[in-house]
């Protein structure tokens, strides 16, 4: 692979956004913008980080750039628990979590009414709702123990050399099957 820049950080941005400089939407953000998500309980665009660390230029690689922040990626960690805090705290059982989120949304929407040009605030409001919805869909989507032993072997999960990469490939397949447009 080649790029217009010999500098790895700029080349990564070029690969992901088509531009050498940051501030432009990446391809996943464009897909999320143009196609949306098939499943409203899961994000439309997911990034899975390499277990050895994030890429050069970090989150600029999955940024929504000048588009509203709601189109940026949802990051999933590598390993056995790709999404933290999927289970609500014990003190928020029953309807209390929904009531808390509704109150928070009302405050945020009041705040947003005077700052409608702030897409980060709109994205924050949307992310709270998505996180709430993900509590029902995501645990099943990321539970690869439901796959047969043959499938786990085919993805290399039984070999320490390929287990981490295989886990991400299998997780990506499961997410796409459930409506995530871009991984």
Where are these predicted regions, by residue range?
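Ligand-binding pockets and gating/stacking loops
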Residues: 1-183
């Amino acid at each position: 692979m080649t790029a217009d820049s010999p500098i790895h950080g700029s080349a990564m941005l070029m690969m992901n956004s088509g531009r050498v400089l940051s501030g432009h939407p990446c391809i996943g953000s464009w897909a999320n913008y143009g196609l949306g998500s098939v499943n409203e309980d899961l994000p439309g665009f997911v990034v899975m980080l390499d277990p050895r660390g994030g890429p050069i230029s970090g989150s600029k690689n999955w940024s929504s750039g000048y588009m509203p922040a709601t189109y940026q990626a949802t990051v999933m960690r590598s390993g056995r628990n790709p999404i933290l805090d999927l289970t609500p705290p014990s003190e928020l059982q029953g309807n209390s979590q929904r009531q808390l989120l509704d109150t928070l949304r009302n405050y945020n929407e009041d705040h947003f009414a005077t700052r409608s040009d702030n897409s980060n605030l709109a994205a924050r409001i949307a992310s709270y709702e998505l996180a709430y919805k993900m509590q029902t869909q995501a645990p099943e989507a990321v539970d690869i123990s439901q796959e047969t032993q043959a499938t786990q072997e085919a993805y290399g999960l039984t070999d320490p050399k390929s287990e981490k990469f295989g886990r991400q490939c299998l997780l990506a397949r499961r997410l796409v099957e459930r409506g995530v447009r871009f991984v």
